[in-house]
Amino acid sequence: MKMVELGKTGLKVSKTAIGTVPLQRLGFDESVRLLRECYEQGINFFDTSDNYGGSDEKVGAAFAGRDVVIATKVSTEKYDAAKASIENSLKALRVEAIALVQLHNPKQIDNGALEAVQEAKRKGYVRHIGFTTHDLKRAMAAAQSGLFDTIQYPLNFLSGEKESELISLCNSLGMGLIAMKPFAGGMITEPAYSFAYFRQRNVVPIYGIQRKSELDALIALENAPPNMEDETFRKQYEAERVRLAQQFCRGCDRCAGVCPAGIDVNYAGRIGDFFYRNPPSKYLKDDSWYNKMQYVKECTNCGKCVGVCPFGSDMRQPMKRSYEIFMQFWQRRKEYI
């Protein structure tokens, strides 16, 4: 297993790391078994959160007393709530100190949650502080603020020149850069492409898995990394990147409110993937998501959402595919609630 240093933190982590969002779909014991299998294969870096449906507890049970690097998150901007979140995570993770606590996609960089995490760090309960976001400008600002040791942002082989600037900035500052969405929320079906992308860059991807077969695929790539010098592979890599790049949504929400038809483009284009990473009941328990998704039928292809996207992503077709997936689950909702 390839090991790297996470910025200037001094933490040595596996280049192949694991994100725990999909574990929400698994039972407790099944999750613990899969996490331990990851550890047995040499993976030592695991990203969790206080709002991933019991993920902290699963990680804590899997690795109590083991030498792993755990990154969790506080999903609030309020001091008191963040303080309580850290206390809960310490108990759930069964540790005396958490290696990395990240602010979870906040709108403000300097907020009450940061104050709570800094206080916990002074008291020895947190070793390093990170920042996660889906917004590139916010990621750049957080990196330049001097307040954080790591940045977590959506990156994969579909990323472009703008994201390359974030990678260069973090490298120049000695910051650890963690990549969420290494498979673009399920869009990338050939893991070798993203694996090859990350092997060339000083970025640590967190792969979300929920099956041993997915772990086996990652380990196979560790043992036999794809060769970018291979002309056939390189051509396939570039062709797939061009085909998919314009449909990759980072989830930054810059398109909020621009759709004349009232579509929540940020979520409407991605909810199809959510069903395969989260418990379907989350979106089927009442009519709220059903009502939101009905607006997709009113899309006129005006392109206003494309015009405001910082990356020029075109989510019109992904939205329609997501609508079809949603309705398939909706018709079987009694199976999930």
Give each language-model segment a name.
Residues 39-40, 44, 165-179, 183-337:
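Structured C-terminal cap/extension of enzyme domains
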Residues 50-54, 74-77, 104, 133-137, ...:
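Short beta->alpha linker loops
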Residues 1-68:
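N-terminal binding-site loop/beta-alpha segment at the start of enzyme catalytic domains
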Residues 2, 34-35, 55-59, 85-89, ...:
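A general structural detector for well-ordered alpha-helical segments in enzyme core domains, enriched
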Residues 6, 18, 46, 59, ...:
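Conserved, mostly hydrophobic/aromatic
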Residues 10, 42, 94-97, 125, ...:
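Conserved functional loop/turn residues at catalytic and ligand-binding sites
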Residues 19, 49, 101-104, 132, ...:
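Conserved residues at the C-terminal ends of beta-strands
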Residues 29, 36, 69, 76-186:
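Glycine/proline-rich, positively charged
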